[in-house]
Amino acid sequence: MKVLILVLLAVVILQAAPIRKLEDLLPTRYPPDHELVYWCTYANQCDFCWECVHGICRNRIQADWPVIHQNDWIINCTVSRWNGICSYYEGPRNHTDHQMDCANPTSHTYPHREYMKIYERDDL
């Protein structure tokens, strides 16, 4: 019986998906494209989350977000990851550094609609 339990335990351990450690990310203003969903969920004011053409901006990740006028709400950000800690720096104007556990992220920016300057068709 003990042998059977040990064999079953070994099979479960061998078949378990390995826990993948996230690679460290040096500070950058341009995170990898495959990480944009993550970063733009928690740092939604960052300029790399928005595509602006002729002063009109669309969120690159969140299709349900409103189209907005390019304005000071969109900021330059630097993101990084080191030993499981993700951080984003809102600067140089705000000089605010946010840190969070990469596995348990929290947003520090909020879509304050009054600051977003939502684009309306009547603006043409």
From Swiss-Prot:
Presence of keyword Transcription regulation: no
Q: Which controlled-vocabulary keywords does the entry list?
A: Glycoprotein, Signal
Signal peptide (UniProt feature, chain positions):
1-16
Q: Where is carbohydrate linked to this protein?
A: N76, N94
Q: Which InterPro entries match?
A: ASFV_fam_110 (IPR004848)
A Pfam family cross-referenced in the UniProt record is v110
Task performed by this protein: Plays a role in virus cell tropism, and may be required for efficient virus replication in macrophages.
Q: Which family does it belong to?
A: Belongs to the asfivirus MGF 110 family.
Q: What protein am I looking at?
A: Protein MGF 110-8L
Lineage of the native species?
Answer: Viruses, Varidnaviria, Bamfordvirae, Nucleocytoviricota, Pokkesviricetes
